[in-house]
Amino acid sequence: MMLLKTTLIIALGGALGSVARFMLSKLISESSTTSFPLSTLVVNVLGCLIIGFVYALFDNKENASVALKQFLAIGFCGGFTTFSTFSNESFNLYQLQHFTQLALYITASVVLGFFAI
């Protein structure tokens, strides 16, 4: 039952994050006169700010709501942008001083993602 509750919480956050991404991207794209993908850049950076705020808010808090953290970090940010997760994982590798893994992860993600497209 707990897995179902967690899954539904994350799904709701993901749905809201996806809609927020669509609306913000549409708003920015309609007001932009350049071919530069400004809306994607804004969404990705904003997603990083949100996930950073969530982890800072809930870090080392014993009474923090696990459900709210999952809703925001995994659900909303996951639906809003996967770039925030990539950046958070990269930052974690940096904090752990796993610099070789960090360089490999960033390089592989960008290069493999580029060629996969």
Each language-model region and where it sits:
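Membrane-interface helix-loop junctions in multi-pass transporters/channels
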Residues: 1-117
